[in-house]
Amino acid sequence: MREWIPVSTSPRGRLALAAVKQFGARSFDQVMVGDLAAAAEVTTGAIYHHFGSKLGLYEFVREDVERRLLDRMEGAVAAGNETDRSAAVQAALLVGFDFAVREGFLRILGAPPAGAEQDRLAALLKESTATASPVLGPVLAAAWRAALIAVAEGAKPRQARAALLALEIRPQ
C-alpha cells in the first residue's frame, strides 16, 4: 500500500499531476524538467527535493498509472469465462487499451518499464495465458504497447483497437 497519497494542491501533488499529463503525452526524453516545474507552478528544485530526479518523478507516476491499469485488467480477467481464457485476456487487453486512450496515458504506458523494473503487465498476461505458451504474456504486452504508441503517433484508436481484437490466443 502506498505510504503517501498526493494532495493535488501541495507542490508534490501538483508535480505528480503535471507529470502524469506530460509523460502521458510525450516520451520521457521529450519532457523537460523546466516544463514539468512550470506546469506544476514550482521551481525545478522542487522536483529534486520531492523525487530526487526527473527519473524518480517518472517512476513514481508510472507506478501509479500502471497500478490503475492493472487493477482494471485484472478485473476483466477475473470477470471472464474460466473455460475461455482467450476471451478473458482479450477483454483485459481492450479494457486496458480503452483506459489508456481515454485518460491520455499513451506514452507512459506505451513504453516498456525502465531498467530492471519488473514488467507487471507482461507478468499479468503471462499468468493469464500460461496454458497457451510461456512467452505469450510478454508478446501480448509488446503488442498492446505497440497499439498505444500507434495511437500516440496518429493512428485512429479504433484501428489500433481492431488490431488488438484480431489477436487470437489458442491453447497449445
List each language-model region with its residue ranges.
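Amphipathic alpha-helical segments that line or abut small-molecule/effector binding pockets
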Residues: L17, E82-V101, P134, P138, ...
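Secondary-structure edge/capping motif, primarily at the C-terminal ends of alpha-helices
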Residues: A76-G80, R107-G110, V151-A155
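Hydrophobic alpha-helical connector segments
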Residues: G56, F60, E74-R102, R120-A122
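Amphipathic alpha-helical packing segments from all-alpha helical-bundle domains
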Residues: L70, I108-A142, R161-I169
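N-terminal intrinsically disordered/low-complexity leader segments
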Residues: M1-S10, Q172
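Alpha-helical DNA-contacting segments of helix-turn-helix folds
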Residues: E59-V65, G110
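Helix-turn-helix
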Residues: P11-R14, A18-G56, F60
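Short, basic, alpha-helical segments at the C-terminal edge of helix-turn-helix-like DNA-binding modules
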Residues: E63-L69, E74
